[in-house]
Amino acid sequence: MAETLQTGLPHPASHLVRAVEVAHEAAVRQSPNGVRFATYGETGVADLDLDRMLEAVPTAITAALNANTYYFVPLALREATENLDVTHDAPASDKPESSEPAMVASAYTDEFSHSAICHRNVELGHGKRGVFISTRLMGDRFALSFEFFINVAHAFVDQAGIPASFSDLVWKQALSNVRGETSVDAWESRNLAFGRPANAQPELLQPTSRRNRNTVPSFSAKQRSFTSNALIPAGSTAVASPATLPQISAAAQQSAASQPAVDEKERGLYLESAFSDSVAIYLLSLALDFDYSELREREYPLLAPTALAARLRVIADLFPPNPTYEFAVRYRRRA
């Protein structure tokens, strides 16, 4: 497990500052691959670890992040802080309920951590956005890196969209009822796309028998009517016998029933979630060696490893790693 970011060492007295003030005062730098970033306060993150994480993002992705600057701060607070000691020059009475200012803690304290959030987006004006990431809420490099990469992935998808090669693969996997997903958002939107409850378990495929083991499963097989395929001579008229018409109707109904009605809005949300998840996991794999099981959560079953590997290979082909970084999928041998 990666080293902890919660060092437990004494730190200076923490105070709160408006996020916009941090953005104004902190020295913004740019990594060699083009990520704009800054640090503020007692982050607990070593410079080498931060550089390794930032430089893992392929240049083909950073080109779409021009509007974002990533601020690594001890704690970014999620909401109003009336009960906390705020030290800034703004009048205490000037607290509009609908637009509370985003606040940042200069160091970790238990009190501030109760109101902190993993990250907070702040509009800085002129089309620029600050993404304030709470480094001291993360237990280790794995958690911090994944939080950063998730934010990068969402920003990238918002700007670049979803490649057809990826969406085709993912939708094919969904049609085949592949086990699990990459996030609760992808899991729920996939279920909703097929008209299932958000937390439903997809129906298992019928087990194959010896007779049909090598055939295409019924959910993707093309339905054919049992009409004659004989050629009709030119100038003649084809007349279906009374016995054939019910067969055609039944075949048409069977074909329609075999194709589930798809909610296109939820389908789009599913593909977007699956793509941003896969980009984030791909970036994480470039920055760190980790076991796939570390991504497991209770709310949904984890995507089958072979299905994830297929998605990540598409991502790697689209956005090759930067120099000194390598993408690899290694399968663990069963004991």
Task: Give the label of every model feature segment.
Residues 141-150, 154-155, 269, 273:
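Active-site alpha-helix of zinc metalloproteases
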Residues 1-32, 209, 218-219, 223-227, ...:
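Pan-zinc metallopeptidase signature
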Residues 57, 61, 174, 311-315:
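Generic structural signal of hydrophobic/aromatic residues within well-ordered alpha-helices
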Residues 70, 96, 214-216, 231, ...:
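Intrinsic disorder/low-complexity detector
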